[in-house]
Amino acid sequence: MIVRGKCLGRSVSKAVSLFSRPISVISAKSFATTTNLLQNSKDDSTEATIPWYMREENSSPVEVLNKIEVPELPENSPQSLQEFVTLLTVEYGLTDLEIFDLSQLPEDHPKSLEEQNEENYVILASGKSEKHIYKAAYELRLYIKHTYKHLPIIEGMSSNSISKVTRRRLAKRVRRGPPATASTFGIGANSWVSCGTGVDGIVIHLLSRERRESLNLEQLYSDEQENEESHSTPEIDQDRLFFGDRRGFHTSSRNFNLNTLSNIYDSYVIDGNFDTSQKFKAQFDLNFKGGSVEEYNKKFELYRAINLVNANVVEANEIEQIIWDKYSSLDLALQQEIDWNTEIIKDTIKYMEFLVDLNARHSPREKLDKLSGFISNITCFAGDSIDLFTIDKFGALLWRLTWVSENNNALDSANLNEIIKRKGDFEPGTNTISFDNELGRNIRELLRQNKYSSNKETFPLWLREQMMYTFGQAGLWDRFWRDWQSILQSLNKTNERIYFWVVTALFLSKVDNRDALRHLFTKYWSNPSGASFVADYTTNNHQFNSDNERMALKSVLVQIGEKYNTSPWAREAAQFADNL
């Protein structure tokens, strides 16, 4: 009989043969096995008597967690700073926190409170991974939203939650192949997230350890003396024979030669002129060895200075060739301590400043074409990707290249600040500029897409002022007043608005456009139904930010009243100056 594919008769015969074996044999084997088990159990009787759930585990000892280090807070810091520090360390698990009080920086520091009004305290923190940073930034945004009733400005936070439209666009870009300037198709890792909290001027940077080391933001927010003390010296290659003597000798030799070149450069800056340019150039070339990056940089500075004085001695292409000689130098390639990415950034900025100095010898389009080719070539020497749009000076110089003037004189924020410092007793050089409107629009859009792409972000105040002054000196007054109104509305503090009113009056008086002055004094100066200087001046208890500011405004109002004394608005401005 077959059941489920097996022979039942065969199974029965096997069962019969099994049970027909002698019982004594089976019992003997079973007894022997039991005896062996008992003997083995005697060796470890203690463990056998303890139930399995009460036995000690042979796991490794539990590691003691590192204690959370909370940095000390600056003196007289707001309570919100303590809240954010506790939140980042205790709640989010971020480490290596550093707090910078920007009020302690020198006045000439680019991040001091005198130079900018947006940041008061800066917090740097490190995350374990990109996911950790994204999670912390997400929770931080929710905390600020529910606690302070507004959304912070967050940059660098990238989520995988992409809309269907964006996915289709990315898929099309993948089929076309990656562009020459990017390989991530706009989706970068959360290695650096910046959060402008909008609370007491506190800005928080969340970075991965690798990105924090490469960016070195501590240097940006620290004093220069502190940076020099904390700067780590490059490692010495100890595998080489007599490494100490050899490297020390070459370093001292390079420093000596650099001092000689620096003295020649300083002498030319002080005593050089059109006739002596060739002599200084020959003396410099005779002592130039090219053994260090600093020597090439000093040569670039001297050649650039000579080109401004006598372009027949040093031509523009010779200045650019200095940079290419530096990157093709075999001696420099063997020096492992050189940070080439930093050099590329510095050389790009220097080259842009050189293009600005060329003035009217080249049009804005020709200058930007030169810059495009230069950046395309120099970035080939970069070990890692470099994002020039993260550098503020790059954006400022990029906008500056959109216009030229006859003698390169133009009003900017530095000139207006100098007028205030001298209480109005300063006459900066002014000139009508030639602005390429289409090119300026393209540059503005380029900056917006690459650095200020979020709809909630706008250009920083200093860049918006630079653009506004460009429009005014180019005679584009419609765009000037449009940007002027936008800036005025963005200023929430009365003292900031007072300062903006003063620099506007100074700017228009130096540009000396009668229609623009009339527009200011008839529409905005004492407007009862909108924004006006008189209203802000009254709200500020008839006070200026400084006596220099008051004297500078008084001086310029008197000049306007004297020059346009036949106009009622000018006489009204002069009467106001008499009461200051």
Swiss-Prot record:
Q: Which topology term describes how it sits in the membrane?
A: Peripheral membrane protein
Reply yes or no: does the keyword Mitochondrion apply.
Answer: yes
Name the principal localization, coarsely classed. mitochondrion
Which Gene Ontology molecular function entries are recorded, alphabetically? proline-tRNA ligase activity
Kindly list the places in or outside the cell where this protein is found, as annotated in its UniProt entry. Mitochondrion inner membrane
The transit peptide segment here is 1-38
Which GO terms of type biological process are on file? Answer: mitochondrial gene expression; mRNA stabilization; prolyl-tRNA aminoacylation
| Keyword Mitochondrion applies | yes
- Which keywords does UniProt give here? Membrane, Mitochondrion, Mitochondrion inner membrane, Transit peptide
Pfam families given for it? RsfS (PF02410)
Q: Supply one GO CC term from the record.
A: mitochondrial inner membrane
Question: What is stated as this protein's family in its record?
Answer: Belongs to the ATP25 family.
Q: Per its database record, what is this protein's job?
A: Probable mitochondrial mRNA stabilization factor.
Name of the protein: ATPase synthesis protein 25, mitochondrial
Q: What does UniProt list as this organism's lineage?
A: Eukaryota, Fungi, Dikarya, Ascomycota, Saccharomycotina
